[in-house]
A protein has these predicted regions:
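Intrinsically disordered, metal-sensing/regulatory segments
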Residues: 1-177
């Protein structure tokens, strides 16, 4: 079995946990710190997409890549709408300061989808690993500032860290994906 194939299950989990660990010990000095971290994460994935994925996709003339790209953009817009701007470091917790369920579900769905290509494109594993570090940091800050108990906070963080590996497992073992 290819080592990168195996790492596709483990590295996204480790990246998210590493980001959360960094966030636990280091807090940003300004509110713009989170936005800069997320800007790096988004720009990094955009660079991988433009320099690595798109040239590879467009070499196959039989594949209708344009439809999938448009579908992916629409899905990303929907996820951004549901997450209420959290991917830009912009959150508004309600007065009770509980984590909005739709925000958490949309971030988990995003992480699950990130895990799907890792078994077919093992070269993406390190890119997703690096992407998960700042995402883990930001999610830690969001969840840690809620009024939930520590047990619930850790449960939310643990569930999020499992989403990308679950996406990899789903594409590997479920035929309908």
């Amino acid at each position: 079995m290819n080592i990168l194939y195996s790492l596709g299950f483990v590295l996204p989990f480790i990246g998210a946990v590493l980001g959360m660990g960094i966030a636990y010990f280091v807090s940003p000095k300004t509110p713009n710190g989170l936005k800069l971290i997320l800007a790096f994460s988004g720009a990094f994935l955009l660079g991988i997409t433009i320099l690595h994925l798109m040239p590879e996709v467009f070499t196959d003339k039989e594949f209708e890549a344009g439809l999938w790209i448009i579908g992916g953009i629409i899905l990303q817009i929907l996820l951004e709408y549901l997450s209420q701007g959290a991917e830009h470091g912009h959150t508004h917790l309600k007065e009770n300061k509980l984590l909005p369920k739709v925000l958490f579900i949309s971030l988990c769905l995003h992480a699950f989808i990130e895990g799907i290509p890792l078994q077919q494109q093992s070269s993406l594993v390190w890119g997703i690993f690096i992407h998960k570090i700042p995402i883990g940091m930001v999610l830690f800050y969001i969840i840690w500032n809620t009024n939930n108990s520590k047990a619930v906070k850790f449960l939310f963080l643990f569930v999020f860290t499992l989403m990308s590996p679950l996406g990899s497992i789903a594409i590997t073992y479920l035929d309908f994906l």
